[in-house]
Structures are given as C-alpha cells and as structure tokens.
Amino acid sequence: MNIKSAEFVDRVKIFVKAGDGGNGCVSFRREKYVPKGGPDGGDGGDGGFVFLRANPSLSTLIEFVNKRKFFAENGKHGMGKKMKGRNGRDLYIDVPVGTVVKDASTGQIIADLDEPGKVVCVARGGRGGRGNAHFSTPTRQAPLIAEKGEKGEARWLELELKILADVGLVGYPNVGKSSLIARISNARPKIANYPFTTLVPNLGVVKYGDFSFVVADIPGLIEGASEGVGLGNVFLRHVERCFVIVHMLDVSGFEREDPARDYFIIREEMKKYSPFLLEKPEIVVANKIDLLEREKLPQRIKEIESSIGKEVIPISAVTGEGVDLLLDRVASIVRKERIEREERKEKKDHPMEKPAPVWRKLPERFEVEVVKEEDGQWVVEGEGLRVWMERFDLNQRDARLLILQILEKNGLEEKLKEAGVKEGDVVRIGNFEFEYRE
C-alpha cells in the first residue's frame, strides 16, 4: 500500500464545464389534409451535469496533472412535431476517496468525498429552451419565437487529497516511524539514517487479531513545518482524517538529545496548522529503547512523562519490544472512533438527489440604460435586458417584438429621450438595429 513519490499528487486544480441546454425549435406542422396544423416546435434537451465520484481504486490525483479541463455534453436542439432534443450525457469524474473539493476562486469547501461511491454535483447543466409550441396565443397563432438553452455552469475547482488512514505517525525525521510501520504492517518503506528519507506518506494495513486498521507515516515534520520548512506543511493535511495520532520520540539520545522539547515543537506546528489536530486522541511512544542502557530506561521514561504530562509507552521498532502494548492501545481507540463515526453517518446519511438544471427567471422589472458609443450609435443596455437577450434570438421577429414590449414596460421611451436620442438616430439592442421614430 506504499505510494511511490513519482505517482503521488495530492493537490490539483481542474476546470469543469456543464453542458449547455439545447435550443427550442421554431416549426409548424405541415401535413396533407391538415390546413391548420399550428406550431409544433419541440424543446431543447438539458445540458449534461458534471459530478465527482469517490473511487476506492484510486490513491492519487496524478490523472489530473496532464488533463485539467472537463466538459459535459450539450443538450440537443428541439425538432419539429414537438420532439424534444436529447439531454446531454452527464460526466462523472473519478477521484480518490478522501478528496476534498473546493471552489478555486473562493476557497469554499463544496464537498468532502470521504466514503467510497460518494458523489457530488460540481456543475449543473443548462435547461433546454422551449420550442414555439409554447408561445401560441389567441393573438399569436403562428409564433416565430423559441427560447435558447441556458448555459451550463463552469468553474475552477481545487482538489485536495487527504489520505484516509485510521492512525497517523508523527515525529521528527529519523525517530523510527518507517521502521515501526514496516514491523507492524505490510508496508515496505525505504529506511535510511538521514533526514527526509520518507518523501511521501507511507500507508500500511495492520492486522491485529481479527481487527485491522490503516497507519500512515506522515513525513517531514520539523520546527517551522506549518510555515513551509521541510516537508511538513505539504503533508500535515493527511493527519486531519486520522482517528488517533501516534507521536513518536527518539529516546536513545544519539540523534535527538531532548525528546520532550521535540514533542512540544511538533505539537506547536500541528496547532499552527490546525488547532483541531490537538483535539485528536494521542499516544506518545519512546522509540529506540534497544539503544539505551536497561538500568537508565525507567528514569528516562519518567523524566519525559514528567516534562510532557502524558504517559509514554517505551518501544523498539527494531526488536518489537513494547509494540504489542502500543497496538492494543491503538486498536482500542480506533474501534471506539469507528463506532462513533458510523453512528454520526446514520444520522445524516441520505442519497444525493440530482439538482434542477440551470434556469434563470426572466426579470419583469429592471433598469434600462441608453449609452452613446464613440461612433455615435446609441446602445440600449441593462443587466435584466442581457438575460432576455441570452434567452431569445433577436433574428426571430416575435422575439424582437417581445423584448421591445418588455423594454417599453421598463421605460425605454423615457430613457431614450433623457439620453438625447433624436428621430432618425440608429439605436442598437444586441445585434439588432433600428431607427428611432417618435
């Protein structure tokens, strides 16, 4: 279950774009012996949605290094005979379990995909536009108007992988974390006597009787880690998911002279990164007791316990002494935390419902602006007007009439006069131009 450094990527940015809705159709029924067929333009199909899905077979975000942009399918346009266009296919993007999804522009967390199969919608498709069959009235029996489909949502996302491990091993480099994980699990990490031997989190599955749990060796913690010194700020996020923290100290005195000082430095770095980390259950272990004279061990452990105010379990990752006691303590905490997690999950667990497609309500009231451009042409603008123009095609006669009616209701005539528009001046609305007549 080791993660090779060449393949381990735990933070990326991706762009997602949902499909646009298909346009409604302008069509009229034309059949022999049906002289008054009437409008039969069908609706456009909805655009495809974009979902992220937690896949337990993935362990890294490496797939997103070379492919960062993802697009769902657009809805198909409506057709005659009131035939609705096909909806665009939804796009499912698989990510590792434990991926936190954030809006890249705001930093807001959208979802935490912390369970296999968990799904979140990150971009909604646009609703398909209505065909002209919807616009028939007693006074407009042959409507030359249909709606354009809504644009699908688009956004940049930040994906941040937080490893799902039950136990996090923390401590200064070379205190023996990799040696311990190699002894108690199936992991075979690289072990050497120099700082930052471990460059990525090592994961190991520990089988303890009929119980099993996952342990993660969190690399690179030194003073200043929370601010980017060493590798700690890169990997501290992986501690956040652990049920229990095993804080390892070097008690031999050969490399680390003051284990108590080391303990407080690491705890301070964890606090700076997230005070929440200090609330997690913690087991403190003193490693490398095989390198210490036996008669000095009890006094050494007592001094450390007195300094940090916590019980310390003496172990040797090399010989295995004390490891069974450590595993018994760890397994007890993990069992308890898993039960509590399942109880919390049952209370809030509910299936995800697919949200409605994007469909903006057309504003009835809005501000109208008349602006004179450098070429002397007058342009009608307004946020509400923009929504109407995005919904309808001004090349369609009835669409132009409808928008002009809405503009009249919102004071277009008065705005034109206030701006100084004179008879014969050219006024533009979108891509449509007309001469002003009083």
Swiss-Prot record:
Entry coiled-coil feature ranges: none
Superkingdom: Bacteria
Keyword Metal-binding on entry: yes
Residues holding GTP: 171-178, 196-200, 217-220, 287-290, 316-318
Pfam families from the UniProt entry: DUF1967, GTP1_OBG, MMR_HSR1
Keyword Nucleotide-binding: yes
GO biological process: ribosome biogenesis
Compartments it resides in: Cytoplasm
Cofactor(s) of this protein: Mg(2+)
EC number: 3.6.5.-
Subunit structure, as described in the record: Monomer.
Protein name in UniProt: GTPase Obg
Native species: Thermotoga neapolitana (strain ATCC 49049 / DSM 4359 / NBRC 107923 / NS-E)
Gene name in the database record: obg
